[in-house]
A protein has these predicted regions:
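Short Fe-S-cluster ligation motifs
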Residues: 198, 202-220, 251-274
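Immediate flanking context of iron-sulfur cluster ligation sites
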Residues: 160-169, 210-222
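Auxiliary alpha/beta "docking" domains used to position bulky ligands
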Residues: 1-167
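Iron-sulfur cluster-binding cysteine motifs and their immediate structural context
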Residues: 173-199, 214-243
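Short, charged low-complexity linear segments at domain edges
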Residues: 139-162, 191-210, 259-263
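Long, compositionally biased charged/polar accessory segments in the mid-to-C-terminal portions
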Residues: 264, 272-288
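Extended alpha-helical surfaces
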Residues: 233, 239-253, 268
Length: 288
């Protein structure tokens, strides 16, 4: 398959943007990741995060895709988790692309926020966006409300060059409005004060952590730094049907619901992986 055929297949899958990188060891990312230090919920081995050959020895290309989701509204669940689980939806949509690659004799692997490599850094390298002070990747056309996936393949494709982006305008609104004060100048980030991290954290919360969550109004995730970002104003992006239907914007938990019942009821939602106890704890904070 040539690049044009691959890009067309990606577009037909419902992706809003696509970029391609040559598979290589991304040594320039090692320093960035070292400076960031240990971050929860992501691969800790920097080599695995920067070397695609550890997953596919004969990899030739990395195809990076953006899938838009609905902008934030008035909710208690972060908008990314309101619709059907994006891991499942995007993987299923991209299987049409990997099937075509297979038919042409190529191997491929799909990753959507479930692989060791950094989707955001890969997307940045192939020109799909720039970083805001909130740490989100921002695309000039569709803002930052999108999921990122990538396909690793042994099909050799022409690489895309990083685009000349205008970059973050530096208004500091995300820093100003962050309920926990997790953001700071020079793109600083403290996950222990981030509402999204705290609502996913297991175990007992400290009084300060509890107050941060209650201040935000969210029981899962947080969209405030995206909601106030000027780069998300006036954007128009096509959104696939799976991310527009059966939305859950709030959640009440029956006292008697078992872990098994919870898992069955919400198995198609991105928030279900943390289990009942974390969500119930968060909900109870607003009933005190």
């Amino acid at each position: 398959m040539n690049k044009e055929e691959v890009v067309l297949a990606i577009r037909n899958s419902g992706a809003n943007a696509v970029g391609i990188l040559k598979a290589r060891e991304f040594l320039e990312l090692e320093e960035i990741l070292k400076k960031r230090g240990k971050v929860s919920l992501v691969e800790s081995d920097i080599k695995k995060r920067t070397n695609p050959f550890l997953m596919m020895k004969d990899a030739k290309s990395i195809i990076v895709c953006l899938f838009s989701y609905l902008p934030s509204n008035n909710e208690r669940i972060s908008v990314y988790a309101q619709g059907l689980d994006y891991h499942i939806v995007i993987k299923k949509r991209l299987e049409g692309v990997t099937d075509k690659l297979s038919e042409n004799g190529y191997k491929s692997m799909i990753f959507c926020d479930n692989g060791p490599m950094s989707d955001r850094l890969l997307a940045n390298l192939c020109g799909l966006g720039f970083f805001g002070k909130n740490g989100m990747l921002i695309n000039e056309r569709i803002g930052s409300y999108f999921f990122i996936a990538h396909i690793l393949t042994d099909c050799e494709l022409e690489e895309d060059k990083p685009a000349e982006n205008t970059g973050c305008i530096g208004c500091n609104r995300c820093i100003e409005y962050c309920p926990g004060g997790a953001l700071s100048e020079a793109f600083g980030f403290d996950e222990n004060r981030c509402v999204s991290f705290l609502t996913q954290k297991k175990g007992e919360l400290s009084p300060e952590e509890t107050e941060i969550i209650k201040k935000s109004g969210y029981i899962w995730g947080c969209d405030i730094c995206q909601k106030v970002c000027p780069h998300n104003k006036g954007i128009e992006a096509e959104i696939i049907e799976e991310f527009k239907k059966d939305l859950i914007t709030d959640l009440k938990m029956d006292e008697g619901i078992s872990n098994r019942e919870f898992a069955k009821k919400f198995s198609d939602r991105a928030f279900s992986w943390r289990g009942k106890s974390v969500l119930k704890r968060n909900i109870d904070l607003f009933n005190e």
